[in-house]
UniProtKB/Swiss-Prot annotation:
PANTHER family listed in its UniProt record: PHOSPHOGLUCOMUTASE (ALPHA-D-GLUCOSE-1,6-BISPHOSPHATE-DEPENDENT), PHOSPHOHEXOSE MUTASE
Protein name, per record: Phosphoglucosamine mutase
Annotated EC: 5.4.2.10
Textual note on the cofactor: Binds 1 Mg(2+) ion per subunit.
Active site (catalytic residues): 104
NCBIfam families tied to this protein: glmM, PRK10887.1
GO MF assignments: magnesium ion binding; phosphoglucosamine mutase activity; phosphomannomutase activity
CC annotations in GO: cytosol
């Protein structure tokens, strides 16, 4: 019988800091349980631990460290560092486990914990369930003897290691001389490494969202609030703008006119570039159910096939591994380039876009506009208690909407994996139809809550 997860969601454990499940007590117990799960044999075991710039990161970090040490694991601390850097360093240092303390694009009051195996990939649902089962048990008799308690140390060159790894994804012999780039690091984990990597490659770098104070992460900046980036690109006469999120596993682009370029366009651009160079391992490009139908048509024109998964970069990665594909991503900006990373890496993806810009010598507004997207609308409906998604009235409304859209459009209803929200998305060539269907579905979901 398979074990079930209660704490872990689609991207680790996440919640409001100092409230269940993001408490000191749970973080410490998680450290103990994960430490025991990944301690095999009598040799010293090590966990690599990083975080973003949230104030609560100090608290969660200390709790996790105490848990891991009590389980007999040595802890290597790297401080604020992008999520993909933690995955990369876990592999590079031959650590038994990697941990990232971050709530990604969420507000500063939230925090989260993501776990990576020794191969740098996020843990499977089954392994997370095993850790939860250990957390629910009495671990007192299984913790380390006094002479086997772990030690904590700090890795001082973590930033430099990640910067060099990211730069290695940029074509050898090419530079960014003459390019003026605005980089928005969301006051998050990449505030030092991303601007430095671009500068070392020769770009003129204009920084915004690079002054974290513990509470301003993702605040009116970064990939979830790209308006400041778009304005800065125009104001500074920049060639391109790059927006990362709080843990730098997402990226969005602004062209020289200050217009936003989403993950679907970025994915199509990299697919075309890599396809021309013979660098694609597969004719299948992996994206999620949120990706625009225009992306599918664009890839078809390139002789490629779009394969869809559930939302979440972990599911994109899993499908890529099954297919042997080396390129996948999400409309939200998660770009997985498995030649260079085991998870979404915003900086590495941005460097692929910049490589095309340098190669073609054309403006970003021309290079990055790969297709005209279908009109698409996404709305979130917050709920309390039980999800209204499976209510008969909602299902009836869904069937009517899908019949009306036919094969010329799509309707997607899904529950968020991190918040009590139902996401309603529709797309079709007729924008008025899209707007009406989304409005009707949102009304049906709201009405179902009232009835319940």
């Amino acid at each position: 019988m398979s074990k079930t997860r209660h704490l872990f969601g689609t991207d680790g454990i996440r919640g409001l800091a100092n409230q269940d499940p993001m408490t000191v007590e749970i973080a410490q117990k998680l450290g103990q349980a994960a430490g025991l799960r990944f301690t095999r044999g009598v040799h010293r075991h090590r966990v690599l631990l990083g975080k973003d710039t949230r104030l609560s990161g100090y608290m969660i970090e200390c709790a996790l460290v105490s848990g891991f040490l009590s389980a007999g694991m040595d802890v290597t601390l790297v401080g604020p560092m992008p999520t993909p850097a933690i995955a990369m360093l876990t592999r590079s240092l031959r650590a038994d486990l990697g941990v990232m303390i971050s709530a990604s694009h969420n507000p500063f009051g939230d925090n989260g914990i993501k776990l990576f195996g020794p191969d740098g990939f996020k843990l499977s649902d089954e392994t997370e369930a095993e850790i939860e089962e250990l957390m629910r048990s009495d671990l007192a008799g299984r913790l380390a003897a006094p002479d086997r308690i772990g030690r904590a140390s700090r890795l001082n060159d973590a930033a430099g290691r990640y910067i060099e790894n990211a730069k290695a994804s940029f074509p050898r012999g090419r530079r960014l001389d003459g390019l003026r780039i605005v980089i928005d690091c969301a006051n998050g984990a990449a505030y030092r490494v991303a601007p430095t990597a671009l500068w070392e490659l020769g770009a003129e770098v204009i920084r915004i969202g690079c002054e974290p104070d513990g509470i301003n992460i993702n605040e009116q900046c970064g990939s979830t609030k790209p308006e400041s980036l778009c304005e800065a690109v125009v104001a500074h006469g920049a060639h391109i703008g790059i927006a990362l999120d709080g843990d730098a596993d997402r990226v969005l682009i602004a062209d020289e006119k200050g217009r936003l370029i989403d993950g679907d366009q970025i994915l199509a651009l990299i697919a075309r570039s890599w396809g021309r160079q013979g660098r694609l391992n597969s004719a299948q490009i992996v994206a999620t159910v949120m990706s625009n139908m225009g992306l599918a048509r664009c890839l078809e024109g390139l002789g490629l096939e779009l394969v869809r998964t559930a939302v979440g970069d972990r599911y994109v990665v899993e499908r890529m591994r099954e297919l042997g594909a080396n390129l996948g991503g999400e409309q939200s900006g998660h770009m997985v380039l498995s030649d260079f990373a085991t998870t979404g890496d915003g900086l590495v993806a941005a460097l692929q876009v910049l490589a095309v810009l340098v190669e073609e010598g054309r403006p970003a507004s021309e290079v990055c506009r790969m297709f005209t997207p279908f009109p698409q609308m996404l709305r979130n409906v917050r709920f309390t208690g039980k999800s209204p998604l499976h209510a008969p009235s909602v299902q009836d409304a869904r069937r009517r909407a899908e019949a009306e859209l036919g094969t010329a459009g799509r309707l997607l209803l899904r529950e968020s994996g991190t918040e009590p929200l139902v996401r309603v998305m529709a797309e079709a060539e007729d924008p008025a139809l899209v707007e009406r269907i989304v409005a009707e579905m949102c009304e049906a979901i709201d009405s179902a809550q009232v009835v319940a």
